């Protein structure tokens, strides 16, 4: 790509915004031009605005330390300086919806990590390897918003970015009929570190607000189809989920039990995973994993501590595939799929 796009981060001081800062450092396609946050941070240098809250494992890039943080609510000021923004604000959903639409109506495309617009019928919720074709809904969204260039696209919830990619290559030939999913989600998914979440030490919390509903509903939008001016959800598979917060810093784990319309052999499943390539791989996107799905043969893998950084944290790690007494198969998965890890860019 010859052109370098100017990008901004709206919500730059939070944990998700910090992750964007690290991922965009030295990115060949994008130049980080604007950092925006709440009015409390506006006018400060990024280093001062973040202060002791820098939560990444790598140091804050020198290139952003002295950048002046802008007020995210001053939409025109931010939008006029960038080609598009990544949005990672922490606000009530109605306020996020309004803010993201304001940026889109200012002809500034929005790529959002937030959940506010995930079920807006004409907003694509995209996992590039799964449903890149859903971006074709954008002209219909632009018509509704009255924009020529602006639009909103969102990423899916963190809990499903391991098991949906693992099931997807099996859908066409075998048909997934139902799945039971238990997720064991790292504290970074809550935007926390251990020193900011002492209640998780030596503990498991068997509830994450809203997470189970998202884990059951959002895959159906990802597997849905465009019909007119909206995305229509798929009718199956039926998914039931239980979500736990566990004392792990990064990397969500999932235990998945799955049944098929036509039961595959174990060898067919392994072959489907090994051969799967999505648009992100075909386009050779800078941060896309070369091999999206990795299968581990060891009986005690995958593990978050050992495997979460496979392919720079962008791969899905699968293991322990075996037949089940109630479902056809059961398996384990690991992915750094928390909100601080966006899709390949």
Which positions does each model-derived feature cover?
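Histidine-centered active-site/metal-ligand motif
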Residues: 27, 252, 335
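Contiguous C-terminal substrate-recognition/catalytic subdomains in enzyme active sites
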Residues: 78, 203-313
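Short, well-ordered turn and helix-capping elements at secondary-structure junctions
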Residues: 243-245, 322, 340
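Short FAD-binding loop at a beta-strand-to-alpha-helix junction that anchors the flavin cofactor
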Residues: 328-333
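Single conserved hydrophobic/aromatic residue that forms the stacking wall/gate
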Residues: 334-345
